[in-house]
A protein has these predicted regions:
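Conserved AMP-binding/adenylation subdomain of ANL enzymes
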Residues: 87-104, 112-152, 166
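Conserved ATP/PPi-binding loop(s) of AMP-dependent carboxylate-activating enzymes
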Residues: 232-236, 245-278, 311-313
């Protein structure tokens, strides 16, 4: 992926820690950011200490920010975002979440993706103390919360699940937590239920994307009352639900989510990639609807929706149903090609280690879905895996799914 990123995005300098230098095989200049003396390549600290004699402008212009997409479907894309002149969009985060100055926070969200990167900037602006670790370890996170009496946790749903699994009975004292902020991937009803049962009803939701930053936010009370919501539209954000022709759909009807704000992307570093825009609004790539209380509900990725025998099926709904099934530790649903129905639902499940997991069968999974969803949502293919392939944000990477066991 690194070679692909360099080629597609026109990268002409690579900055690395020297522990990764053996993985680098490129034709572009390499600069060592953290050096233990093991490499003879140029060092970042020497460059900083010996700058060229260039006169800088007294009032420099803001430069664009480039963030990389998560790369779940292929090579990560370089996303160009403007630096906002006012923090209007981010105001919705501190308005929705009880995140205040001088608090102590646990940051699990990956700092090289938009959620962690945005939170670092907010935390620095609020003079927060940030506790973070190089690699996520559930026991270490729980110990950090207990030891440092942390006020908040910034993370993603898959990590909440790991925390609950490690400490369901409250062995660690986490009573200091005033909020848990979630973003990065879908916050499902089952994750909300388990997380709030362990930590109290302090889970807040933030929905957006690397391309378009913040779309909606939901308070802890709103999430507890209705775990299916993504939240209300953030301040400074314009959001519309449009059909395939780019026309607004009626309230309550599913369509593609389009939005814009002052931090929305202006383009890609790869000039060959194009934005999907309608009247200045950019598609976030998800399907959803606005309910009668102005809450946004996200039903899945626009390119994930499949048609089974003429019926629309959202794989995310199958995933959410199966997350509540005894014996399932993790699960992912998606579409595969079918010669008769054009497409069909497939499920990749990781059984639990207990008796329920050992007794789990493909037919039991199908029966569970059949009792809760329409017949066209019942998976034809069921694969049992040791674990689901995930990226640093906790998202499942579909192209890496394999069929360890099929039934």
């Amino acid at each position: 992926q690194l070679a692909g990123c360099i080629e597609e995005n026109g990268i002409n300098v690579l900055v690395v820690d020297d522990e990764f230098i053996d993985r680098v095989d490129t034709d572009i200049p390499v600069i060592i950011a953290h050096d233990t003396g093991a490499s003879e390549l140029p060092k970042l600290d020497k460059i900083v200490k010996n700058p060229p004699a260039v006169e800088l402008p007294r009032f420099p212009k803001h430069g664009p920010i480039v963030l990389m997409s998560s790369g779940t479907t292929g090579i990560p894309k370089g996303i160009v975002r403007p630096e906002p002149t006012l923090p209007v969009v981010l105001a919705s985060i501190v308005d929705t979440i009880p995140w205040r100055a001088d608090q102590r926070l646990q940051l699990t969200a990956s700092i090289f993706h938009t959620w962690g990167w945005a939170c670092i900037n907010i935390a620095l602006g609020l003079r927060n103390t940030i506790v973070t670790r190089r690699v996520f370890d559930a026991e270490q996170v729980l110990d950090d919360v207990q030891r440092y009496r942390l006020d908040g946790m910034i993370s993603s749903p898959i990590f909440f699940k790991r925390l609950v699994e490690r400490d369901p009975a409250g062995e660690f004292d986490t009573s200091s937590l005033k909020f848990i902020a979630s973003a990065g991937n879908a916050l499902t009803p089952e994750v909300v239920k388990e997380t709030n049962a362990r930590f109290g009803a302090i889970l807040c939701n933030v929905y957006g994307s690397t391309e378009l930053a913040l779309a909606t936010t939901a308070t802890m009370d709103q999430v507890a009352a209705n775990p299916t919501i993504a939240g209300r539209v953030a301040s400074g954000t314009k959001l519309r639900i449009l059909d395939k022709e780019g026309h607004p759909v009626p309230r309550g009807e599913v369509g593609e989510i389009y939005l814009t704000n002052s931090t929305a992307m202006t383009g890609y570093t790869n000039p060959n990639l194009r934005l999907n825009k309608v009247d200045g609004l950019i598609s976030i790539g998800d399907l959803g609807y606005i309910d009668e209380h102005d809450f946004l509900h996200v039903v899945g990725r626009a390119d994930d929706m499949i048609i089974v025998g003429g019926e629309n099926v959202h794989p995310q709904s199958v995933t959410e149903v199966l997350e509540a099934m005894p014996g399932i530790h993790e699960v992912h649903a998606g579409g595969v090609e079918d010669s008769e129905t054009f497409q069909r639902i497939a499920v990749w499940a990781v059984p639990t280690a207990d008796a329920a997991g050992k007794a789990l069968t493909a037919d039991a999974i199908r029966d569970w879905v059949r009792t809760k969803l329409a017949d066209h949502s019942v998976p034809r293919d069921v694969h049992f895996l040791a674990k689901l392939p995930r990226n640093a944000t906790g998202k499942v990477v579909p192209r890496l799914l394999n069929n360890d066991s099929e039934a």
